[in-house]
Amino acid sequence: MKVKVGINGYGTIGKRVAYAVSKQDDMELIGVTKTKPDFEAYLARERGIPVYAASEEFLPRFEKAGFEVAGTLSDLLENVDVIVDATPGGMGAKNKALYEKAGVKAIFQGGEKAEVAQVSFVAQANYEKALGKDYVRVVSCNTTGLTRTLSALQEYIDYVYAVMIRRAADPNDSKRGPVNAITPSVTVPSHHGPDVQTVIPINIETMAFVVPTTLMHVHSVMIELKKPITREDVIDIFENTTRVLLFEKERGFESTAQLIEFARDLHREWNNLYEIAVWKESISVKGNRLFYIQAVHQESDVVPENVDAIRAMFEMADKWESIRKTNKSLGILK
């Protein structure tokens, strides 16, 4: 029997999760919500996805445009087993009462505080902790990226120091910035380090900057080691870590631009690069310190985590069975 899934919020993350759910043989996409009849709503309808108004207050917008919706969020909740909340940060916590009243399990995104859910989730790091849970939070794109590589190295970690170089806005966002500035997060740690600690128990400090680009985030990671490891060991670990790929500058991957072009060349939906990209040349061990640089596609790296979270919550598969199914369905390279 397939798990019935609804998506509350059909934007950058919501539409990608909807696509991913539609590719699973053990899930059924029941519908998505929108606050207005914009081009995304029309495209969803053309793709055969039932569109619901996010609440009754938004119905006049659809009526004015002659856009017939399948109902409201309340109607959607009556027909699903789980709702993926992909609304803007902070809205998920407000929506939780609706999900509780409807008796529906819910997945929240990283824009929500950890307290909104019973567990913060990255599949390869703590899948088992989400088994049977009613409320799970998939952590943010940056936290997911850090957790993927750090969890693979966890036994070697004494202390992590990481700098987040964050994109200013998503490609479709014409309202955010900066356009001609670099904006530091002046408090230390930035929120990313404490967020990683909601998934894996490590010592970590983070700093962050926002720069004028839309393509990806970049992380500069330095780890103080508690036991020896060689560069070759790290390369071997990353080569055998799911959803992490090594890229080489000498093969043309000089920047995030080429990484996104790689995703385009793979004919990925929306240029999705689900995998965390680590520059192989950046991996360096100096004494008891390990260094590497990685890039995170902020629009898509959390998408497979949402799919795996559904399976964990309904105990549909064990960790590696779920990861394998999700990876295969989305064309994730390893």
Curated annotation (Swiss-Prot):
Active-site residues, as the UniProt record annotates them: C141 (nucleophile)
Q: Name one GO biological process term.
A: glycolytic process
Cite the entry's keywords alphabetically.
Cytoplasm, Glycolysis, NAD, NADP, Oxidoreductase
| Gene Ontology CC | cytoplasm
The protein's location, in the record's own words, is: Cytoplasm
Full protein name: Glyceraldehyde-3-phosphate dehydrogenase
Assembly notes: Homotetramer.
Return the CDD domains for the record. Answer: GAPDH_II_C, GAPDH_II_N
Residues annotated as binding D-glyceraldehyde 3-phosphate: S140, C141, N142, H192, G193
Which Gene Ontology molecular-function terms are recorded? 4-hydroxy-tetrahydrodipicolinate reductase; glyceraldehyde-3-phosphate dehydrogenase (NAD+) (phosphorylating) activity; glyceraldehyde-3-phosphate dehydrogenase (NADP+) (phosphorylating) activity; NAD binding; NADP binding
Task: Kindly give the Pfam families that the UniProt entry links to this protein.
Answer: DapB_N, Gp_dh_C
InterPro entries listed in its UniProt record: DapB_N, GlycerAld/Erythrose_P_DH, GlycerAld_3-P_DH_AS, GlycerAld_3-P_DH_cat, GlycerAld_3-P_DH_NAD(P)-bd, Glyceraldehyde-3-P_DH_2_arc, NAD(P)-bd_dom_sf
Family under the similarity heading? Belongs to the glyceraldehyde-3-phosphate dehydrogenase family.
- Write down the EC number: 1.2.1.59
Q: Which organism is it from?
A: Thermococcus kodakarensis (strain ATCC BAA-918 / JCM 12380 / KOD1) (Pyrococcus kodakaraensis (strain KOD1))
Its top-level enzyme class, in one word, is oxidoreductase
Q: Which SMART domains match?
A: Gp_dh_N
Quick one: where is this thing mainly located?
Answer: cytoplasm
